[in-house]
């Protein structure tokens, strides 16, 4: 993921700050904000950032109610969060990501995806045991990319797979100009 100095990045479901810290380490000139609903986890993230002197802000909040102004981020990232959300909450969270992204901004999601082989279906079983069968079902059915496009994003691409192919890396772009028939966060 290419980022330019001065860009603003939001990490939805930042947890203990691992992804936010990695982004800041690789791109020290970007402004990184993490958001998570767990205060104890956010305390851990803040301690980790202070320990390495990384200027990262961690806010308390939810993916489906982002406390940020419209068009305030150049990138929105999320790692292993969406499979935890109910289908209707996924839709609202994606609309919120769309809302806070600037036109031309990018959404990057790493999350459980549809298995492509019998081996991948077996490999995902421990993941499902840990996170719950119900929590992962929607993503394993391949619905997340459809929801991303239905939200109004363009240029959706699966840019790779990790963890034995279980986790898909998705990138999509908020259009620079929205047409009247395109779904937005207000539809």
Name the predicted role of every residue range.
Residues 8, 104-106:
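Short glycine-centered segments of the SAM/dcSAM-binding site in methyltransferase folds
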Residues 75-88:
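A short SAM/SAH-binding and catalytic strip from SAM-dependent methyltransferases
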Residues 91-103:
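A short glycine-rich, Lys/Arg-flanked "PGG" loop and its adjoining helix->strand segment in the class I
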Residues 1-5:
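Conserved alpha-helix/loop element of class I SAM-dependent methyltransferases that forms part
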Residues 169-187:
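C-terminal lobe and adjacent flexible extensions of AdoMet/dcAdoMet transferase-like proteins
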Residues 64-75:
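A short acidic, Gly/Pro-enriched loop at the edge of an enzyme's catalytic core
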Residues 10-12, 16-65:
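Class I SAM-dependent methyltransferase SAM/SAH-binding core
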Residues 25, 108-151, 155-168:
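C-terminal alpha-helical "lid/dimerization" subdomain adjacent to the S-adenosyl-L-methionine
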């Amino acid at each position: 993921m290419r980022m330019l100095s001065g860009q603003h990045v939001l990490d939805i479901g930042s947890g203990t700050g691992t992804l936010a810290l990695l982004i800041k380490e690789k791109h020290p000139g970007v402004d990184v904000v993490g958001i998570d609903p767990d205060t104890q986890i956010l305390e851990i993230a803040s301690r980790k950032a202070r320990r390495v002197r990384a200027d990262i802000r961690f806010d308390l909040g939810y993916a489906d109610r982002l406390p940020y102004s419209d068009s305030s981020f150049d990138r929105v990232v999320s790692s292993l969060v969406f499979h935890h959300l109910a289908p209707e909450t996924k839709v609202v969270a994606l609309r919120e990501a769309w809302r806070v992204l600037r036109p031309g901004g990018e959404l990057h999601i790493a999350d459980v995806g549809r298995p492509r082989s019998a081996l991948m279906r077996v490999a995902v079983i421990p993941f499902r045991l840990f996170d719950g069968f119900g929590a992962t079902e929607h993503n394993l059915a391949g619905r997340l990319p459809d929801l991303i496009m239905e939200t109004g994003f363009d240029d959706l691409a699966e840019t790779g797979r990790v963890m034995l192919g279980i986790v898909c890396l998705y990138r999509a772009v908020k259009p620079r100009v929205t047409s009247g028939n395109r779904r937005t966060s207000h539809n």
